[in-house]
Amino acid sequence: MRGTWVALDDAVATAATGDIWLFRGRSLADRAIQTVTNSPVNHVGMVVALDDLPPLLWHAELGRSLPDVWTGKQQRGVQLHLLRDAVATWEERYGQRAWMRQLEGTIEREHEDKLMEIIARYDGRSFPTTPGLAAQ
């Protein structure tokens, strides 16, 4: 399947829960993540677009450049951000290229409810330490 260029505002306007955003950078840290994970990308986020909320991006990052929509605070770890702001930050501030992959199929109300439970459970959770990861 061949990709098509889409303006960020158009991508945000058509965003649906379950869509995936992929990011690829060139910094030393980005390349390290790509190498360790054996992946061509170094960051992934999932769209959360429910009811009357603006489209959001649920992802985890070391930075705290944007306020978390769930807590209202700037935090590290698992975060929920306005989709447009998050993608713009990753492209402009962090120098990442971004790709969007739309979910095929439908999300039912029960899926949305479970997603909200998971977000409530994990939002704000920090990354494990390197020794903690090594112990697993």
Predicted regions and their residues:
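Cysteine-nucleophile amide-bond enzymes
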Residues: 1-136
